[in-house]
């Protein structure tokens, strides 16, 4: 296993290029060792992946809803919707403001679309009828958002993914934490993480606080970055092995939200969805970067490469 010190950004200058070598320990010995942290190599997502049955129809793969978009930020909704569909979900409905209706219907014809509000989403209703819910990409921050987010959290019993501006609303109103359904998936980048859970002085403290907060609120926390870290309320933490610097680009997180929401809607338990989704997101990014270079990679390339990642 990698040592924790090799996996945090602040130590990169001291580590150089790190390779994990086989020193001959038996698989039985390694599997018997209980460790808090795990390195997510390909064996974990392969074990989690569920092939599609031959005699299947779209109803077998769930109905997801994405609450996303606002005036000037409909691209986030489009990116998230495309990724959700590429993840294998059976049906997708997007809730967007009226200004985004034509944009979404034109850019993602495979998705259904409902509207509320004109330039931003003013309310969210009937959320309980979906198999999974993703909230946040491009919604902006407006006074009404806190009210409908609270209502959604009170009504929903289906798995949730919370990202982007929905995380910032949650950070401004920490009383909403008590309403989060068990095993909700939060996907903050490091700055969003500190707004949610408090300042940290180094990467080791961030990992520790993520583990503590995951147990405290019974949620899954995906701290995005190189070697994205998934903190689980069962006391385990996972470092992702896929991804590259080219994925540090606008919209990459919206793609991840779509993937996670789609996997949840298909019936993957939240922990499995988080691990598989983060791994696939990074692998699709690696495939895209190999084609276009990390510098030229854009978020849409990630969702377009999901097919190869599944293969």
Predicted regions and their residues:
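Small-residue (G/A/S/T)-rich helix-start motifs and N-terminal tracts that mark the onset
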Residues: 3-160, 168-185, 190-311
């Amino acid at each position: 296993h990698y040592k924790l010190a090799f996996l945090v950004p602040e130590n990169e200058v001291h580590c150089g290029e790190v390779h994990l070598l086989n020193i001959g320990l038996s698989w039985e010995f390694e599997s018997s060792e209980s460790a808090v942290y795990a390195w997510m190599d390909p064996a974990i997502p392969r074990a989690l992946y569920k092939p599609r049955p031959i005699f299947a129809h779209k109803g077998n793969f769930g109905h997801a809803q994405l609450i996303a978009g606002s005036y000037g930020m409909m691209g986030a909704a489009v990116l998230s919707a495309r990724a959700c569909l590429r993840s294998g979900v059976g049906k997708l409905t997007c809730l967007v403001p009226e200004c985004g209706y034509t944009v979404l219907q034109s850019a993602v014809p495979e998705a259904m679309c409902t509207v509320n509000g004109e330039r931003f989403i003013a309310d969210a209703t009937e959320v309980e009828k979906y198999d999974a819910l993703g909230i946040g990409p491009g919604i902006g921050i407006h006074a009404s958002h806190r009210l409908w987010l609270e209502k959604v959290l009170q009504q929903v019993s289906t798995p949730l993914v919370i990202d982007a501006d929905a995380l910032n609303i949650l950070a401004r109103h920490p009383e909403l934490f008590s309403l989060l359904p068990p095993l909700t998936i939060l996907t903050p980048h490091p700055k969003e993480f500190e707004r949610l859970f408090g300042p940290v002085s180094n990467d080791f403290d961030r990992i520790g606080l993520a583990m503590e907060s995951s147990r405290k609120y019974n949620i899954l926390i995906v701290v995005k970055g190189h070697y994205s870290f998934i903190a689980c309320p069962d006391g385990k933490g996972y470092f992702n092995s896929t991804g590259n610097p080219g994925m540090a680009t606008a919209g990459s997180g919206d793609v991840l939200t779509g993937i996670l929401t789609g996997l949840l809607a298909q019936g993957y338990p939240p922990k499995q969805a988080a691990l598989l989704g983060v791994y696939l997101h990074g692998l699709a990014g690696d495939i895209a970067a190999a084609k276009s270079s990390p510098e030229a990679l854009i978020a849409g390339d990630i969702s377009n490469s999901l097919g190869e990642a599944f293969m």
